[in-house]
Amino acid sequence: MTIIDASERIAQLRQEIERHNYLYFNEAKPELSDYEFDKLLEELMALEREFPDLLTPDSPSQRVGGTITKEFPVVTHREPMLSLANTYSAGEVAEFYNRVAKLLAAENVHKQEMVAELKFDGVAISLLYRDGVLVRGATRGDGVQGDDITPNIRTIASIPLRLHQPLAGEVEVRGEIFMRKEDFEQLNDNRPEEERFANPRNATAGTLKLQDSAEVARRRMNFVAYYLKGLKDETLDHVSRLHKLEALGFTTGGHYRRCKTIEEINTFINEWEEKRWKLPYETDGVVLKLNNVQLWEQLGATAKSPRWAIAYKYPAQQARTQLCNVVFQVGRIGTITPVAELTPVLLAGSTVSRSTLHNFDEIERLSVMILDYVMIEKSGEVIPKVVRTLPDERPADAHAIAIPTHCPECDTPLIKPENEVSWYCPNEEHCPAQIRGRLLHFASRNAMDIKGLGDALVEQLVAWGLVHDVGDLYLLQEPQLERMERMGKKSAQNLIRALDESRTRSYDRLLYALGIRHVGRATARELAHAFPTLDALMQANEERLAEVPDIGTTVAQSIVDFFAKPSSRQLVDKLREARLQLAASASKIEQVNRNFEGMSLLFTGTLERYTRQQAAELVVERGGRVVESISKKTSLLVAGRDGGSKLDKAHKLGVRVISEDEFMGMM
């Protein structure tokens, strides 16, 4: 291929890829499967490698990341990125509306049209485009200066690297980066329990600060635009600018409305208070802006916020209930967590009977007692939390919560490490709760995926003394299992079969399954690449470990401490005897493709070459996930013999159906 041919093909591929990016992220109308899209991207990247002079910063290939930024440069915003003043009641909204009316009357302006739009619960950023090409992305920072995070911004597919319409000179686009609920849950599922993010906004903020843009690219984030500055025609009103942003390739969320009266504003606010829970992302309020942009400058701003806009914040979903008891749970790494047992109450569409109290300090801060009436809140967090007590309603028989000094499971004196807020049980080898926690983690779907090994059975195995660590699982025999409650011959056979199948799980999944503190799925993969055998990893010191991407001194120390324990070395010996994968297989780690990255697959009918478990393993190893029911979000339905009703449903929903042969070809 000549450089001229390559240039033409590269231009075609870039245009096609950006079109499909826009359809997927902005219109939610994908025309290609993830596999087909990835093939286009692979072709583009191959051509750019072959003809490096044709690589440009606005190429879609630059979204995959790979840049390591040791320190983000500080940049000054062209105009301050002010935060909006918040309101929390209809009365405050009316005060704002009347205040603007008064200011406009002073300017001899009598048309007061407002725009109401949903407030995304994300992280504000500024994008600078020069002659239509993205040249900088920066955080809000203190409003005057922010961090230049351009390498991370380039990885977000809903941000165009080149505007869809030609614009000369410089224009600035501002908006919010956020994470969809589904992507947030998937990210948390792959993190150690103690390092999970509380909500999508925290996950977004933490991701944008990462120094490795390749890791940012792996975490699916989105962008919604709400501000455009630098157009030649500055007379456009706010709604017209939102339309212009959409024409330039951005999504604006689509949920905004012109409002000419305070009644119309209140209608929009009330309408979305309930509807927002059905959205695939978090929204915590409504932003109100004067539609006439020319008046923004005339109305001006205070030191902190503009006078022409305000944010109405929905109250967090709260409910009143009674705290009946507090139990202290012991996690798999020994963390003691107080959990409130509550009178069941309906909150945000579900019945809540338990709520976290986080730690002992939180109990003291809340001054909460047994039998107190409390307010619980659900505001994007993983589980509800107690936010305050109602002391005026305290019953006469309310009594203090007995804070334990010893482990509620094994009676070992608790310890509180320096610089930590939680108390721990140090008896990790013999504490039944910690053993149960490690077994359940080992058997979980993202780890060894041992079907049938649930809470009830694990509790019996530990109570009967049959299992002391995960290595003992592979010594279990059918007759032992048949004697357990609700474990007949068939269930025992199924569990033994599931344990046998787990012996083939990849080395990186085994590393995650070991439950080393601070080692999630992503870190386990990096370790498997850096140390191809478990023996090599066990011999590594902190300095060598810290050289691995995304592993700092804390994680390195945790790994060294884990393998320094005699019990850990004994466990490795058991796993070796059980014939588990203690080394990286070239097919599973080194050379495995990622053809199913981000895809959800469903199997139906009988497969000729694989069991369902084997097929699912192949999908997960290649970046995909296997679902149990079909929906519009399903990427592919793999149809074996006698596919049944799922085939009909797939055709109705427009889900792509492939044969087992096509499935093999994709691998």
Curated annotation (Swiss-Prot):
GO terms for biological process: DNA repair; DNA replication. Its EC number is 6.5.1.2. Keywords: DNA damage, DNA repair, DNA replication, Ligase, Magnesium, Manganese, Metal-binding, NAD, Zinc. GO terms for cellular component: cytosol. The keyword ATP-binding does not apply. CDD domains: BRCT_DNA_ligase_like (cd17748), LIGANc (cd00114). It comes from the Bacteria. PANTHER family: CHROMOSOME TRANSMISSION FIDELITY FACTOR 18, DNA LIGASE. This is DNA ligase. It comes from Chlorobium chlorochromatii (strain CaD3). The lineage of its organism: Bacteria, Pseudomonadati, Chlorobiota, Chlorobiia, Chlorobiales. The gene is ligA.
